[in-house]
Amino acid sequence: MSGSGSGSCSYFIFEKAKNTNIDSEDENNKIITIDSNKQNVYILPYNNLDYYKNYGLFEKGLIEWSKQFCSSDKNMLDIGAHSGTYSISLAHLCNKVYAFEPQQMTYYSLCGSVALSNIQNINCIKYGLGSETQIGIQTLNIISDDGGGSTLHCNTSTANNSNVLKTETIEVKTLDRFNITNISFIKMDVEDNEFNVLLGSLNTLKNSNYPKILFESNTYNEKLFNFLKALNYNVITINGVNNMFLASTN
């Protein structure tokens, strides 16, 4: 699959299987296949092909570690789902997964990955999440061909005006407006917008008894950490993983 326009990205299909030896590669169609006993299928950015071939999915150790926070009778939120590696890998352990991804091409790869994996309990949602003051149409700054690092903010640790490849208009809502309940686990990767997402999620967090939150923070965000502390969350660093934290009330 190929994107179009300035700063576009080509994609390939990655079939995750028990045997991780690559049997075939089709450069023309940008597809790699990993034996016929496939389990999950991911449409992933082609510029990261060498990494996927050599090491597998990004953050696969974190994905495996996150399984302990999923429950078959509870829901998971994947906020900043990208191509769905967390959602698809964890869906079988959850009642339902709500995967939020506002960037157009990345959202398409997410939906395609879910469809090719034939997973029925993932709801792909093309909205950005934020605070009440961010509701409406916002500008998403895209700083990478693979869709990673896209942010609503410039002049931050993630993006500045000089490294923005292009922009895209997206619609932002608060998480509370979706009225999702019975949540056990939230994975959040929203590139410096974590505080605003949580501001718009207070009722959701309360109604689900403050689920565990795995999140990325590229800099020490005192406002974010103090906000979580005020909600009685304890925040711990993830050993061996840069900039990743777990917020938990127990």
Regions found by a protein language model. Name each.
Residues 3-250:
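Phosphate/nucleotide-binding beta-alpha loop and adjacent structural elements of enzyme active sites
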